[in-house]
Amino acid sequence: MSKLKLTLTAAVAAGALTVAAGCGSGGGESEESAKWRTATSVEDGGGMDALVSAAQAEGTLNVMGLYPDWANYGGLLDAFSEKYGIEINNDTSSGSSQDQINAVKNRQGQDSSLDYLDTGESFAVASTDEELLATYTPQTAGDLPEDMKSADGTWYNHLGGTVGIGCDDKAIDECPTSFADLLDPKYKGKVALPGDPTTGESGFMIVYAAALANGGSLDDIQPGIDYFAKLSDSGNLIPSEAVAGTVETGETPIVLNWDYLLLQWADNIKDKGVDFTTTIPSDGTVSSYYAASVNADAPHPAVARLWQEFVFSDEGQNLLLKGYVKPGRLEAMIDADTVNKDALGKLPEAATSEPAPQPNQKQRESQQKVLADNWAKAVG
């Protein structure tokens, strides 16, 4: 039986802040935990058996925002807990990247601090600069492309997705398959975004995808802004923020969003009679990945490293794949024939046949400024 504990309320999380550190990087830490705190790999710490033994002695994994119904985190946490007999404290009262960084900073030396962080890549980069993350290399990290891991070993891309087009197949006679298609007058009042591109990652990356579909590049997002100005002027783009519920009611029958979210929405509203399909735009798209990292001040340093090993193992990556995300090691697992083919087959073929481009940190920062300066003027 798994030992999964969800901390669901802010009050509980706040109360946890008062707990003194029994296992943190301060006094009272066991010799084995102290050894693993400085270990940069399984080999450096004495091998996998030694890591498992030390982790089981610590007994608990503290994480935040790993919502059970997102990316199959529920299945991943259960499998880890059952395999190693480790209790999971999963604080789901909050969970944004910034929330996790704040928790790490505010809970220094406390039992309640996080062992593991699951953040946007830009947050991992910033956290590395602030020396909040431990250097630790999972055994399978060599399978990751160089642009999907930090040079100093503080973070690794474990899951991600591709911008796609979701469409209510019953409400729309012919679903669009490209950004160009979305400009067709027959889609007037039908197309929606998940939110304001100037304040949200999803919207920002959707504009990036539109730029690549219209002659832009990862260094030039302006064609994407111009595209959405045209889509808005045509009346095709509506101001509603799309969620699964607005698809179900028919308010937003066509939605641009991450493929893994669209696929999850389809599952959630299928029993409502909605046939929601997901297509990767044929004329251009982008991908984006989350970063997995270990808190340098983790109260359970051996557990944190064992969890990192599990996330990047074949088992862990396949469990994430069941949640419709693209595991970081997907290409290597396909080559090694260790991928779950049934789960892989549920992803759009175009999302897995060829990796979509992903902007680097410098490109993100420069183009976010372009978007912030020009979106409201162009689209309103």
Where are these regions (language model features)?
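Sec-dependent bacterial lipoprotein signal peptides
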Residues: 1-21
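Bacterial lipoprotein signal-peptidase II cleavage site
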Residues: 20-34
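Short, polar/charged alpha-helical segment
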Residues: 46-56, 66-87
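Extracytoplasmic ligand-binding site segments that recognize negatively charged/polar headgroups
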Residues: 62-77, 89-105, 111-251
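A ligand-binding cleft/hinge motif common to bilobed small-molecule-binding domains
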Residues: 123-126, 248, 254-274
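Periplasmic-binding protein-like
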Residues: 160-164, 225-230, 236, 271-296
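Mature extracytoplasmic/periplasmic domains
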Residues: 286, 290, 294-355
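Extracellular/periplasmic bilobal clamshell ligand-binding domains
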Residues: 336-380
